[in-house]
Amino acid sequence: VASRREFTGSWEYMIDNAIFTVPIHPNWSGAALINNEGKLCGIGSLWVNDAKKSDINQLQDNADEFLKDNPKNSSGNMFVPIDLLEPIYDDLVSFGVASGEQRPWLGMYTSEIKNQLFVSGVIPGAPADLAEIEPGDIVVAINGHKVTTLSDMYKLIWSLGAAGIKIMLNLYRDSDDIDIMVKSDSRYNFMERRKKH
């Protein structure tokens, strides 16, 4: 295990205490992460460039520059901790989704660059697309609260209520500040799930 830390993805995805391993393993998707006692502790989810980033941050000021210059030293796999999956396992097997209220989802890809949040894409037909959010927009605030990291943005959006709530985005576009109201949805309404036989 190279590090344990929060992981945020551009696709409205976040895990609080993800497990990062090195060296990278090519067959990572769905792989079991077994501890020294032979117990399952994680399920393989992603290949990442910055598995050692938290350790690098302690050693030098510019971790991103180091990672760019030393990709082989930092590439690895991200595992979802098994304790996050156990409570929803039966629902996932039976229905393909956890039961209960779903988080609000906007259907946009967002990149965090130097304390700014850039919209890098929107999913056709998703709430962000219907609200006419555009690639290149900069997300400044959510419901009047300034956001500068993906983590802050996701936590704020998810704290507002269940899928279906309306969310006000303050955006910077073409040198103008604009406000756009987005009616959120559940991401599962836009995903094809496994059919139960």
Predicted features, each with a name:
Residues 23-27, 31-32, 106-141, 145-148:
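PDZ/PDZ-like domain segments forming the peptide/carboxylate-binding groove
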Residues 90-97, 118, 131-134, 140-142, ...:
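PDZ-domain C-terminal substructure recognizer with occasional recognition of PDZ-binding tails
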Residues 51-53, 146-153:
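Short, Lys/Arg- and Gly-enriched loop/turn segments at beta-strand edges
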Residues 39, 127, 152:
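Residue-level recognition of oxygen-bearing side chains
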Residues 8-20, 30, 191-195:
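Short, solvent-exposed secondary-structure boundary/capping segments
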Residues 1-7, 56-59, 153-163:
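Short, compositionally biased
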Residues 5, 18, 36, 40-113, ...:
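C-terminal cap/linker of serine protease catalytic domains
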Residues 1-14, 78:
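Chymotrypsin/trypsin-fold serine protease catalytic domain
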